[in-house]
Amino acid sequence: MLTPADGEALAAASGDPARLRALIAARREAIRLEHARHRCGGETVAALTALMDAVLRALYRRVVVAGDALDRPGSGCAVVAVGGYGRGELFPASDIDLMFLYDPAARGEGLAVSKGLLHPLWDLGYTVGHSLRRIRDCLELGHRDATIRTALMEARWLAGDRTLYEAFERAFGARLRKESRVYLAQKLAERQGGYDRYGSTVYLLEPDIKKSKGGLRDLHYVSWLGRACYGAKSLDELADRGLLTASERRDLTEAREVLGVIRTEMHFHAGKAGDVLTFDEQVRLARFLGYEDRPHLLGVERFMQQYYRLSTALHQTGERFIRRLQRPTVWRRLTTAVTAREVETVFVVTRDAVSVPDRRRAAFLADPGAVLTLFAVAQAQGRPVAESALDLAHHALSGGPSPWLAAPETQRRFFHLFASPGIGRTLEMMHRVGLLEQILPEFASAKGLMQFNQYHKYTVDVHSLRAVQAACDLAGGSGRLAGAYQIGRAHV
C-alpha cells in the first residue's frame, strides 16, 4: 500500500513532470511485483486507487491551492471521483473518471480547477473522462440517463469544497431513493442487452471477464441495485440487513477477489485494457496462478473449471438477488391465487409453477427431504419449480450435504424419477440449486469442467444434462429420428 513517504515524494515532485512520471512508474512497478508475488486482487486495485488519489491530490495542492489544504469550504468547487475510480476499483488500464462539481456562483472556479488538473494529468499519460456539473445538472442528467446515474452513485470526494459535495450527496441520494423502481427497470434492461452482446451463457469458450454473463458486471449490478433500492453501500451491509445470505455474500466476495486477480494480471501483462479470456490467455493465466497439469486433466482445464464454477455462482446469486427486488404485479398475484391448489401440504401448484408459500417456508426448511419432494411434485405435475422455490431450495442446501441425502430411501426416490417424463428439466433444476452433486457426489467433479479445445461448446456437466434432455425429446418426439430412437429403445 501507499506509505506516507510515498505521498510526500509525490507531493515534492508534483511541480516536475519528468520526476513525477518516474515516481509513478516506480510505484506502479512495485504494485505489479506485489501482485505477482501475492495475487491479491482487492489489495492491488486498492493500491492503484490510492496511488491515483495521491497523484491527483498532489497536483491539486500544487496547481490549485499552492498549499496543504484539500478541503476548501466555500470555494464552490469539489473534485469528485466517479464510476469505477469512485468505487475504489482502479485496475491497471482503467480510465480515470472525474467530475468537477461547482456552485452556480463559482463557475469560473470550476473551470480553473478542471483546467489546472486535467492538463497535468494528460501530460502524465492518463486517460481522463471528465465533466463539469452543478448539483442540478447531476440530478437532471441522472434522471434521464441510467449510466450517468450509476457513475454518480459511486461518487467519492477527493478535494475541494466538501460542504458542496455533501449537499450533492444528500440531493442525489433523495432522488435515487425516489426513483429506485425506474432505475431497477432501466438497469435490468441494460443488463439483458449486455448479455445479448457479450454472451447469454456463462460457458463461453473465450469469456469477457467483465461483461459476459457471470463476469464482474454481474457483481456490479448487485451493488448498484442494492444501493439504489435499499441504500446499502456494501455487500456486508446487504448481508447484515438480510438481503444476501451468508453463502451468497461468500460467493460474491470470492468472485470479486478471483476475477480481480485475473483482470489485474491481464491488464499488467498486456499493458492496456483487455478483458477477453482468449485461449492463449487461459494457458498463460493457468501457469501464472499455479495450475499444473495432472494425468487426464490439463492445468488450464483446472483453471477454467474454477472460473466457470465461480462465474456460475456469481451469476446465480445475482439472479436470486434481483428476483427479491422485483414485486409481482397485482394481476399476477390475483391469477396465482385463483389457480393455486395445495399438494403434499407444503407446496402450491398453479398453472405456471410449483412453489412454496411463505407460510410453509419454515416447514420446508425443517424437513431434510422437502427439496427432493419439491422436484418430484414438479415433475409429476408437469410444471417447473418457481424461481422463489428454487431460491429456497438453494438456501436449504447451502449448509452442505445432509446424511439424509446418502440414505438408501433417498437414492431410491431419486432414481425413481428417471422412470417418469420430464427428468431432463428436473435434473437441470436440481443442478442449479446444488442438489444433484449432493445426491451424486461423483457429479461434482464434472461441474464447470471444460475440455480445452474449440470443439466442445459446453462443460461436462451441462453437456451431460443436455444429452439427457435430448433423449427425453426423442422419447416424446414424432419425427423420423425420434421414431428410430424409440424403436431402438424398445429393444434395449
Where are these regions (language model features)?
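A nucleotide- and high-energy phosphate-metabolite-utilizing enzyme signature
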Residues: M1-H491
